[in-house]
Every structure is written in structure tokens, then in C-alpha cells.
Amino acid sequence: MKEKFIALLTFTSSLKNFGIKFIRVAILVVFVWIGGLKYFHYEADGIVPFVANSPFMSFFYAKDAPEYKDHKNPEGAFVPENRAWHEANRTYTFSYGLGALIMSIGILVFLGIFFPKVALVGDTLAIIMTLGTLSFLVTTPEVWVPNLGGDEFGFPLLSGAGRLVIKDIVILAGAVVLLSDSSQRVLKTLKK
């Protein structure tokens, strides 16, 4: 039994390089998919609470934060008045730019499989982006269960939006591992 356990550990201990490449592919898939969704109105509408409440991003929008609450669309719904408001707010223009940025970061991270110097840029940007996303836990009221009369609300009870945001901590951890790997690979070439 001990021999089988040692054989299993020997195999799993050899997965580090595969795991690092797999993280790069996973980030590519998630970032290209999510970035691509930013070109659809329902997704652009959905990020408005995050952007509007962020001190780092709210300047991209034309309208003040509280106004968006009157113009929320259920996913898949088309409400002409709300669409006009989002167009005037620059919701879609910002979302298109954000989508392009997210997809570009995913591609740069993926290219790190082949080009460690490119990976340094992509990995660093992935870290910055996920830190920005995690900042929404502080800036966006919608990440916590609202007080609607029940006894379960507020911190630490994450809403659907909050549960979505908190998962970025896993991407952040992966990006830190990738940055370390890229740095080691670049250092090897510089020491030659």
C-alpha cells in the first residue's frame, strides 16, 4: 500500500509545470469568454453597479451612481427607456473597452506558455485587474444581501453579485503563481 501511495505522490508531484500551463489556459478561457460577453447589452447593464460605485472607474460613466438603480434591466429584457439611459451613460462604450482589455489580458497570460517576458506583463495585469474586481467588495452595496425586512443581511452575507466577485481571489492566487513562474523563467535567461 505504501508503494502505491509513493507512486501516486511521485506522479502528482510532477504536475507542477502542467498545472501552471493549465492555469494559463483557464485564465485565457475565462477572460476571453467574460471579456467577449462585455459586447452584449445584458452584460454591460449588469456591471453598472460595480463601475458606478467604484472610485477608480465611475468617471467613465456620464451619470451619477444612484441613478442606475432606476434603469436596471433583468437579464435578457429589452426596455427601450433603460437602453436609452445606458447609451447616454456610456455604459456600452465602457463595456466594449473593458471587454477588449480583459480579453487582451487573457491572451497575454496564455502567451506566457511560450514567451515569459510577455507573461510578466499579462500576469501583472491579471493581478491588477483582479484586485480591482475584489475592491468591489468594499465599494458596491449590491455585493451584500440587502436588508429587506429579514434577519439575514449585510456583511458577511454575500449576494449573488458578491459571490461572483469573491471568486476572483482564486484567479488572483493563480496569477501570483504565474507571475512567480514567469519571473523565474526570465531570470534564467538573464543569468545566461
Predicted regions and their residues:
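Membrane-interface extramembranous regions
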Residues: M1-K192
